[in-house]
């Protein structure tokens, strides 16, 4: 989903061909010569290595053996067992959180509330229930003292989780002392802000462990001024494994995202090789051009780097670098948050200054990004339905173990997909370690939601994006103004006796009406756009 493929090896690009390559500026002069460097610099280092994947199909029996040898040869060191709750998880882009209100979030099936403690100037994460009568704290507010207040009975809590006020308690005696009781405290989780991301450690007893481990970081290029960055988050109604398989698969780009970030006529063999793997994840690259390096850092971090050497008129030779980094956070069974951070060092459209000063606003970038999500949505829904149906056949049925029997993956383009499925089976216990029970008879979202609901941008993205939410509200206000202007100009057009003035007023009414309609159509980019692959020629 989140990888952009640029498949020219050494070519002269004409103006008519430029649409085949994403990020090209409309003002670029043509012809444009682009060549790919054959060098293979080591982006990631790990001593574990595996054999290169074969390029010919094998039988089912030999395929299972080959997969086990290829991806299962890593040796676990003592204490290296993977534990789902022993990691930092990014839960949101900080710029998309409102510090004035509590925000609900699910992580590994556990309900949390995220809120900003203005006394300590830190973000906090609590269990989303009040210790009094178990009401959700996310329905509360920040009181006059900057504490999180429950909306049910008004109990308030400080950033450390301790209760600071019980309105119903007497001023003396046992009731007055209740506010100091450990039972009156909210359950708090470790949090950390790093590179614009809010991370949560999903173990309230894991403070020492959390303090000893740094959260996963974006590459250093994201902090360099020569790189232009775009960030987006969206909540998706399919499972963690479905999304991780998708982001591990560069070969779908040219078809699922035709004329968005890829083109069908650019599809070609992708000779990927897994170079190392283990409980930590896996990494690999291709031997072709452009050079694509990929790394999965368990449990949810996927990095892709694309490198090209470009020969441009006037400016000369340039090294083009594209980073696509995604965090795929398991919220609950059948629901995953995708946070994508991308960067490139060419054709930048961002300038120093505040968000309103940008040439291309963030919300407009998200219109394209959401097209990428939409291009995958219904395809992945259908795939997940098949896997879920298979898993219902038997309580012991493991899709990851049977993956090479359920699917046919004869090419090297699927190497990273197989590597992820093998990692999930060998180290991840085939699924995230959810909090609480997960009833097997409860239908998952992808099995019951309609296409309209699956593609609903408003609830999945606009409501959790500060830029798009603000732009949508502005569109609403402007549209109402234009509708009012239409009525006003139309009403006043009949007043003057001068025909020319009447025509001018009628024209203004038509312009206002057309503008209101155009704005209404653009609003759909924040709410819902149908996506039909067969209609994209």
Swiss-Prot record:
Region (Disordered), start-end ranges: 51-77
Cited function: Catalyzes the key reaction of chlorophyll catabolism, porphyrin macrocycle cleavage of pheophorbide a (pheide a) to a primary fluorescent catabolite (pFCC). Works in a two-step reaction with red chlorophyll catabolite reductase (RCCR). Creates the intermediate RCC through the opening of the porphyrin macrocycle by the introduction of one atom of molecular oxygen at the alpha-methine bridge. Seems to be specific for pheide a. Belongs to the chlorophyll catabolic enzymes (CCEs).
CDD domains: Rieske_RO_Alpha_PaO
Keywords: 2Fe-2S, Chlorophyll catabolism, Chloroplast, Iron, Iron-sulfur, Membrane, Metal-binding, Oxidoreductase, Plastid, Thylakoid, Transit peptide
Principal subcellular localization: plastid
Pathway: Porphyrin-containing compound metabolism; chlorophyll degradation
Regulation of activity: Might be regulated by a phosphorylation/dephosphorylation mechanism.
Subcellular location: Plastid, Chloroplast thylakoid membrane
Protein's name according to its UniProt entry: Pheophorbide a oxygenase, chloroplastic
Any Gene Ontology biological process: defense response to bacterium
Domain of life: Eukaryota
Presence of keyword Ubl conjugation: no
